[in-house]
Design a protein with these regions (language model features):
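Short, acidic Ser/Thr/Gly-rich low-complexity loop/linker segments typical of extracellular
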Residues: 42-60
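Short, ordered, surface-exposed loop/turn motifs in non-cytosolic proteins
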Residues: 22-26, 30-45, 62-63, 324
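Bacterial N-terminal signal peptides
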Residues: 7-15
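Active-site neighborhood of phospho(di)ester-bond hydrolases with catalytic His/Asp-centered motifs
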Residues: 115-117, 150-156, 160, 179-185, ...
Length: 324
C-alpha cells in the first residue's frame, strides 16, 4: 500500500512540475472568417495542428517567447509595415491566440523566389543603394508577367544599429513582394552576457529567429546559426540543439524526398576542407556543427542558402548548398 501511495504521489508531483513549466495556448487559424484545417502552429518547441474548424490547442513551454503559424501552401500571412505577421507573443496560460491567413490568388505551384543577403545598413545614407536594389527587384518581378514571387534576406539586415530596421522595411516594400528575414551576426544585440541576450532586437521587429512555411510544393525553413559567445561582439557559426530538435519535428510532417530550402546566415560550409577538419580560427566563418544539420536533411532534396561572406559560391552534392 505504501509503495502504491508513493507511486501516486510521484506521479502527481511530476504532473504538477510539468504543468508549471508549460502554458496552454488555444485559438483558431482563420481565412475570410472561416477556420482553416490542417495548419501547424508552434511555439518553437512543440507543434499542434488545426482541426476542421481551424481550432488548435498547444501545450507551450512557459519560457518560450512566441507562438506562430507555419503558413501553408496556398496562403499568405498579413504584412504590416514590411513585417510578415505570422506570430504573436506567447500569451498567458489559457488565453486565446488567433491567426489570420490570406488566400493566395491563383496557383502558387509555379512562382519566383529571390534571396538577398548582407545589406548591412550602418547609416541612413546607405538606403539610397538599397532603394536602387529594391527597384531592380521590382523590375525583375514585373518582367515575369504576373508570376507570384516571394523573397528572403539571409541576415545582416543592418550593422548593429537596430533603429534602422523600420526604414529598411519601408524600402523593401518597394519590391512589391513579401520579404521574410533571417538573422545575421550584425543583427545581434552585442556586449551581452550570453547567447540568449543576442536576439532580442531582431525578435522585437521580426518575431521568431527560426520558423517555417510552405510555398507551392516546397518547404522553407529559416534558422539562426549566429551563436554569440557572451564576449564583446564575438560569435561562432553554431546551430543550437533546441533548433535541431524543432527542425526534426517540423520535417516529420514533410514527405521524404520533398524539396526543402533552408535559409540562414552563416554558411554551413564554404569548401571541402572545412567539412573535413575544424579550425578554431574559422569558427565564425561556417557552421561548426553542420554535420548534425546535414543528417536531419538527408531524407530530403535539401538546398541551403546563406550569406555572411559577401561572395557567391555554389556547392552541389553532397550538401546542395548555395551561398550568397
Amino acid at each position: 500500500m505504501k509503495r502504491y501511495l508513493l507511486t501516486i504521489l510521484l506521479s502527481l508531483w511530476c504532473a504538477c512540475a510539468w504543468a508549471a513549466g508549460s502554458v496552454t495556448v488555444k485559438g483558431r487559424v482563420l481565412c475570410g472568417g472561416r477556420g482553416v484545417e490542417g495548419v501547424w502552429v508552434s511555439d518553437g518547441e512543440e507543434f499542434a495542428c488545426t482541426d476542421k474548424r481551424g481550432n488548435y490547442r498547444l501545450q507551450a513551454g512557459a519560457d518560450n517567447r512566441f507562438v506562430f503559424v507555419c503558413v501553408p501552401a496556398g496562403y499568405d500571412a498579413p504584412v504590416e509595415k514590411g513585417v510578415v505577421r505570422y506570430f504573436h507573443p506567447l500569451p498567458a496560460d489559457g488565453k486565446s491566440c488567433d491567426f489570420t491567413l490570406l488566400r493566395r490568388a491563383g496557383d502558387d505551384s509555379r512562382y519566383g523566389f529571390i534571396a538577398i543577403a548582407d545589406p548591412q545598413i550602418w547609416a541612413p545614407k546607405e538606403f539610397a543603394k538599397l532603394a536602387a536594389a529594391a527597384d531592380d527587384i521590382a523590375a525583375t518581378v514585373r518582367s515575369y508577367g504576373g508570376m507570384p514571387f516571394h523573397g528572403i534576406c539571409c541576415g545582416d539586415i543592418v550593422s548593429h544599429d537596430h533603429s534602422l530596421y523600420g526604414r529598411y522595411n519601408e524600402v523593401m516594400e518597394r519590391t512589391g513582394i513579401t520579404f521574410r528575414n533571417a538573422m545575421g551576426n550584425h543583427d545581434m544585440k552585442v556586449y551581452g552576457r550570453s547567447y540568449e541576450t543576442s536576439f532580442s532586437k531582431f525578435e522585437q521587429m521580426y518575431g521568431p529567429v527560426y520558423y517555417s512555411f510552405d510555398v507551392g510544393r516546397i518547404h522553407y525553413v529559416v534558422l539562426d546559426d549566429n551563436f554569440f559567445i557572451g564576449r564583446d561582439y564575438f560569435y561562432i557559426g553554431y546551430l543550437e540543439e533546441r533548433q535541431m530538435r524543432w527542425l526534426e519535428k517540423d520535417l516529420a510532417r514533410v514527405q521524404p524526398g520533398s524539396t526543402v530550402v533552408v535559409c540562414l546566415h552563416i554558411p554551413s560550409t564554404c569548401e571541402e576542407q572545412d567539412r573535413k577538419q575544424f579550425r578554431y580560427d574559422r569558427a565564425g566563418s561556417t557552421m561548426t556543427n553542420h554535420r548534425g544539420l546535414y543528417e536531419i536533411l538527408k531524407p530530403y532534396r535539401a538546398h541551403i542558402i546563406s550569406g555572411h561572406t559577401l561572395s557567391l559560391i555554389h556547392i552541389s552534392e553532397p550538401t546542395r548548398h548555395a551561398q550568397i
